[in-house]
Regions:
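GHKL-type ATPase core
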Residues: 1-86
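GHKL/Histidine-kinase-like ATPase module
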Residues: 49-186
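Extended, well-ordered alpha-helical scaffold/bundle regions in very large, multi-domain proteins
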Residues: 29, 160-215
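Charged, low-complexity, helix-prone segments enriched in Lys/Glu/Asp/Gln
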Residues: 1, 145-149, 215
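Extended active-site and interfacial segments that coordinate phosphate-rich ligands
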Residues: 2-22, 45-54, 121-137, 183-210
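Short, compositionally biased low-complexity segments
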Residues: 20-31, 61-65, 108-118, 193-215
Length: 215
């Protein structure tokens, strides 16, 4: 059992304590904000909500055998599909198409609620709020194949932007040595050839999206 404490912006680093554990392996992270240093009197509801979201993020994108707890309660979100439900409701509430062609790539698409493209994506467990090359990689395949599919079925040429603005993408992927466009790591900058793996969106996935209401 390894325990170590850090204080005052890592200026004070306590000595590690290593003892034999009597329980199953686990990781516990706890912290006490220095309100005076931060210039606040306490944590706002928005801050608490953000912390809660990050805990749910961890639960959704880590191994399914790992139990994640928040304030002593197991988080009821064990996989990426259940995580998607938190955004758009159940599959009955909102139709979506899900696919995992490789352990490194997992994604789902539903119709955008406001006719404006939206994305929720993760790279190696990091939430990329601005998307990036991984989102472009998957979306470009989806849009290109949908244009071809609609052309074949309806004999109509559709602009890529018309399709994109109808969709909402959820994406989780693992990238080798990812690079980001800023220190906030909210946008992936790694070029596609350096991903370390590839992903091909299946034709069946495209057909299901078309039948979902895009076409």
């Amino acid at each position: 059992k390894y325990i170590q404490e850090f204080k005052n912006n890592l200026t004070e680093i306590g000595k590690p304590s290593v003892t034999k554990s009597k329980v199953k392996p686990y990781t516990k992270v706890s912290f006490k904000p220095d309100y005076a240093r931060l210039g606040i009197s306490g944590l706002s509801e928005d801050m608490l909500s953000l912390f809660k979201k990050r805990v749910y993020d961890v639960s959704a994108i880590t191994d399914k055998t790992i139990k994640v707890k928040l304030n002593g309660q197991v988080v009821p979100c064990k996989n990426f599909e259940q995580y998607i439900d938190l955004y758009v409701g159940s599959k009955t509430d909102t139709k979506r198409v899900y696919e995992q062609t490789d352990p490194r790539w997992e994604y789902a698409v539903c119709l955008a609620p406001n006719d404006e493209f939206q994305q929720v994506s993760f790279v190696n467990g990091i939430y990329t709020s601005k998307g990036g090359k991984h989102v472009e990689y998957i979306m470009n395949q989806i849009i290109r194949k949908l244009c071809v599919y609609i052309k074949q079925k309806k004999k109509v040429d559709v602009k890529p932007t018309t399709i994109k603005e109808q969709l909402m993408l959820f994406l989780r992927c693992d990238i080798e040595n990812p690079s980001f466009n800023s220190q906030t790591k909210d946008e992936l900058g790694t070029a596609v050839p350096k991903f370390g793996s590839s992903c091909t969106v299946s034709d069946g996935f495209i057909e299901k999206i078309a039948k979902m209401g895009v076409m």
